[in-house]
Swiss-Prot record:
Enzyme Commission number(s) of this protein: 2.4.1.1
Keywords, ordered alphabetically: Acetylation, Allosteric enzyme, Carbohydrate metabolism, Glycogen metabolism, Glycosyltransferase, Phosphoprotein, Pyridoxal phosphate, Transferase
Cited function: Glycogen phosphorylase that regulates glycogen mobilization. Phosphorylase is an important allosteric enzyme in carbohydrate metabolism. Enzymes from different sources differ in their regulatory mechanisms and in their natural substrates. However, all known phosphorylases share catalytic and structural properties.
Regulation: Activity of phosphorylase is controlled both by allosteric means (through the non-covalent binding of metabolites) and by covalent modification. Thus AMP allosterically activates, whereas ATP, ADP, and glucose-6-phosphate allosterically inhibit, phosphorylase B.
Protein name: Glycogen phosphorylase, brain form
CDD domains: GT35_Glycogen_Phosphorylase
Organism taxonomic ancestry: Eukaryota, Metazoa, Chordata, Craniata, Vertebrata
PROSITE patterns per the UniProt record, alphabetical: PHOSPHORYLASE
Pyridoxal 5'-phosphate: annotated span: 677-678
Subunit and partners: Homodimer. Dimers associate into a tetramer to form the enzymatically active phosphorylase A.
InterPro entries per record: Glycg_phsphrylas (IPR011833), Glyco_trans_35 (IPR000811), Pyridoxal_P_attach_site (IPR035090)
Binding residue positions for pyridoxal 5'-phosphate: 569
Reactions performed catalytically: [(1->4)-alpha-D-glucosyl](n) + phosphate = [(1->4)-alpha-D-glucosyl](n-1) + alpha-D-glucose 1-phosphate
Length: 843
């Protein structure tokens, strides 16, 4: 008789191995049916389209989960170095389609849903965007997570689970109005709460120096509840984790004040603690020193570092070897990447844990911290740099303030020893800025406390070294690197532009999806008549589809054979949507002046959100909509020029407009845009770029040949020279009649007859204090736009340039970017190892 199984042996039956995957259409249908009835508790008589979406999401998620568990088991066994990407923003967009694409499930799901009498595309459109970011910085983090999973890195994204993401933008009477983005209202099928890993985060209190070391006492505690979202790599069975923290009040919150007798009041006040993760701050490239924001920054850092250290200590390696409780090996097992200065508190927090809690001596702790942390700089705009008042730290994080002072003192002692008597250098390099309000310069803290500092495009990294952190570069040049940004080709080609992806696959196979440099193989096809026709046909189909979408969603009818001239990004003076406006007004005036002349028809689309408190940006939106009101209703103009403001620009709208664009506008003042990634998305999707020599545009021109982009305007050196000389806007206004006419029309109320003074602030800024020198580039921009028109008249030559651009866009994959981070900053190698799927036994 067989020996009875032990409990431990019985438990081996609890395994992901025995669970069927989604091999075929029948299984998808079965799983969909099961989830509709058993998970959502609906039948077809009462199910809503959203129920069908959720049933499909749970079906796809089932397929993910086995791989997710397997991946974590694999990491536990191999114990690789872990990469922790810390960011206050992850702009993920929608998840369903991306998950199906990366798991290779799209065709099976499409067919199953079709067989059930439903439409997959209609279901996909119901899903909310996860809008936990403002723009480029948050979207970069999302692309990076995709690439890290695809490259088999043991990586984790850590951030905040904002209850309300970036606001929804409504346009009312031409003005932006913000609405709360209640993205979790119907639940989120992709996240898994992990209350068992809930962690305390401390605020306020006081510091006591005792013989046993330093104690941070009498703090207020907020709990951080983790929610995990799977991040699937592309067809490699790797599923990484994005862990977002949500704030919860502890059960005894304020109840220690019970003698006050107001139990109800105490429970209601739990909201105060939980407000920490309530809402994303909607500022892009602008620092607003609010205490709640500082709380958010410390909240994510404190929870994440506890989690990192828990994982470090409990790893398999640590069980076998006492070395793990000694932190010497910490930088060999942990890399922390700071996405801008927002998670800068990681540096003093790691020091606090090592010195105060783990009793590591200061110098050793500092060495560990520096080897572990690396910092990515994303902007050179002075108004965007984080400078927190010391008084706020004193109250909120008193121990961290002491640690920052100590870090700064040692740093300044070091600088003083190297540059004796150079007092001004000490002032410039201090973490503490003296003045009426003493401030902590978070960028300086990041540079001092990291072993690597990188910019996000070559030109930006040079500006970082020669200007923003010049003194620090002179001190430690080996620290500074460049890592040109990239985008994931899975979302930004395969998912959003399947027609173009298929056309490319027919010619060069599928390898380019994980090695975008393979697109170079398209270069010999640049004169291939059939390929030229195929590429042009895909673009026309995308334009027709987007035209239909505009008509349905925005009730706007456009001419699909016009040039789609697209300018979509956050609204900011440095991005110069105003330069685009001046071009549009000038074109309008030319049509009115000579209506019989042949014009290349254009549909100009401008989209993007303005920070709610940014008056000028909101006024720019009003100007765009007002110009549209005049131009679009002028019978003389007809179909030749249309101006559309794309309301509520977000990831899911980008996925529609980018594949349809002919012309991509990337026209920031040289030296202002760190990199840009929209520029890369348009390039990969077959739009031509009009742009300045700024950010990644420089490298795009280098890759594709400047003659295959429309480059214009001042370069960084010219901008600097103009600053030294003194920029005088009036000179341009007086000498360029078309510019003068356009500015006068805006100024006089031609576009705002009911409010003639509506745009006086814009004109005043342009004439008297325009930091971004719009007028200085106007003439060159107009000439460049004329070249665009000329080429567009020759569709074949236009498409040849498009093909060259697509073929040369390989550098701009986030896979390449992440490979560089891995090798040159984190000290890990990407892996093309396929983790066995759940139905295959492990080694």
């Amino acid at each position: 008789m067989a020996k009875p199984l032990t409990d431990s042996e019985k438990r081996k039956q609890i395994s992901v191995r025995g669970l069927a995957g989604l091999g075929d259409v029948a299984e998808v249908r079965k799983s969909f049916n099961r989830h509709l009835h058993f998970t959502l508790v609906k039948d077809r008589n009462v199910a809503t389209p959203r129920d069908y979406l959720f049933a499909l999401a749970h079906t796809v998620r089932d397929h993910l989960v086995g791989r997710w568990i397997r991946t974590q088991q694999h990491y536990y066994e191999r114990d690789p170095k872990r990469i922790y990407y810390l960011s206050l923003e992850f702009y993920m967009g929608r998840t369903l389609q991306n998950t199906m694409v990366n798991l290779g499930l799209q065709n099976a799901c499409d067919e199953a849903i079709y067989q059930l009498g439903l439409d997959l595309e209609e279901l996909e459109e119901i899903e909310e965007d996860a809008g936990l970011g403002n723009g480029g910085l948050g979207r970069l983090a999302a692309c990076f997570l995709d690439s890290m999973a695809t490259l088999g890195l043991a990586a984790y994204g850590y951030g905040i689970r904002y209850e309300f993401g970036i606001f929804n933008q409504k346009i009312v009477n031409g003005w932006q109005v913000e609405e709360a983005d209640d993205w979790l209202r119907y639940g989120n099928p992709w996240e898994k709460a992990r209350p068992e890993y809930m962690l305390p985060v401390h605020f306020y209190g006081r510091v006591e120096h005792t013989p046993d070391g330093v104690k941070w006492l009498d703090t207020q505690v907020v709990l951080a509840m983790p929610y995990d979202t799977p991040v699937p790599g592309y067809k490699n069975n790797t599923v990484n984790t994005m862990r977002l923290w949500s704030a919860k009040a502890p059960n005894d919150f304020k109840l220690q004040d019970f003698n006050v007798g107001d139990y109800i009041e105490a429970v209601l006040d739990r909201n105060l603690a939980e407000n920490i993760s309530r809402v994303l701050y909607p500022n892009d490239n602008f620092f607003e020193g609010k205490e709640l924001r500082l709380k958010q920054e410390y909240f994510v850092v404190a929870a994440t570092l506890q989690d990192i250290i828990r994982r470090f200590k409990s790893s398999k390696f640590g069980c076998r070897d006492p070395v793990r409780t000694c932190f010497e090996t910490f930088p060999d097992k942990v890399a922390i990447q700071l996405n801008d200065t927002h998670p800068a508190l990681s540096i003093p927090e790691l020091m606090r844990i090592l010195v105060d809690v783990e009793k590591v001596d200061w110098d050793k702790a500092w060495e560990i911290t520096k080897k572990t942390c690396a910092y990515t700089n994303h902007t050179v705009l002075p108004e965007a740099l984080e400078r927190w008042p010391v008084s706020m730290f004193e109250k909120l994080l008193p121990r961290h303030l002491e640690i920052i002072y100590a870090i700064n003192q040692r740093h300044l002692d070091h600088v003083a020893a190297l540059f004796p008597g150079d007092v001004d250098r000490l002032r410039r390099m201090s973490v503490i800025e003296e003045g009426d309000c003493k401030r902590i310069n978070m960028a300086h803290l990041c540079v001092i406390g990291s072993h690597a500092v990188n910019g996000v495009a070559r030109i930006h990294s040079e500006i970082v070294k020669q200007s923003v952190f010049k003194d620090f570069y002179e001190l430690e040049p080996e620290k500074f690197q460049n890592k040109t940004n990239g985008i994931t080709p899975r979302r930004w080609l395969l998912l959003c532009n399947p027609g173009l992806a298929d056309t490319i696959v027919e010619k060069i196979g599928e390898e380019f999806l994980t090695d975008l440099s393979q697109l170079k193989k398209l270069l010999p096809l640049v004169n291939d008549e059939v390929f030229i026709r195929d590429v042009a046909k895909v673009k026309q189909e995308n334009k027709l589809k987007f035209s239909a979408f505009l008509e349905k969603e925005y009730k706007v009818k456009i001419n699909p054979s016009s040039m789609f001239d697209v300018h979509v990004k956050r609204i900011h003076e440095y991005k110069r949507q105003l330069l685009n406006c001046l071009h549009v007004v000038t074109l309008y005036n030319r049509i009115k002046r000579d209506p019989a002349k042949a014009f290349v028809p254009r549909t100009v689309m401008i989209g993007g959100k303005a920070a709610p408190g940014y008056h000028m940006a909101k006024l720019i939106i009003k100007l765009v909509t007002s110009i549209g009101d005049v131009v679009n209703h002028d019978p003389v103009v007809g179909d030749r020029l249309k101006v559309i403001f794309l309301e509520n620009y977000r990831v899911s709208l980008a996925e529609k407009v980018i594949p349809a664009a002919d012309l991509s506008q990337q026209i920031s003042t040289a030296g202002a845009e760190a990199s840009g990634t929209g520029n890369m998305k348009f390039m990969l999707n077959g739009a031509l770029t009009i742009g300045t020599m700024d950010g990644a545009n420089v490298e795009m021109a280098e890759e594709a040949g400047a003659e295959n982009l429309f480059i214009f305007g001042l370069q960084v050196e010219d901008v600097e020279a103009l600053d030294r000389k003194g920029y005088n806007a009036r000179e341009y206004y007086d000498h360029l009649p078309e510019l003068k006419q356009a500015v006068d029309q805006i100024s006089s109320g031609f576009f705002s007859p009911k409010e003639p003074n509506c745009f006086k602030d814009i004109v005043n800024m342009l004439m008297h204090h325009d930091r971004f020198k719009v007028f200085a580039d106007y003439e060159a921009y107009m000439q460049c736009q004329a070249q665009v028109d000329q080429l567009y008249r020759n569709p074949k030559e236009w498409t040849k340039k498009v093909i060259r651009n697509i073929a040369c866009s390989g550098k701009f994959s986030s896979d390449r970017t992440i490979t560089e981070y891995a090798r040159e900053i984190w000290g890990v190698e990407p892996s093309d190892l396929q983790i066995p799927p759940p139905n295959v036994p492990r080694d």
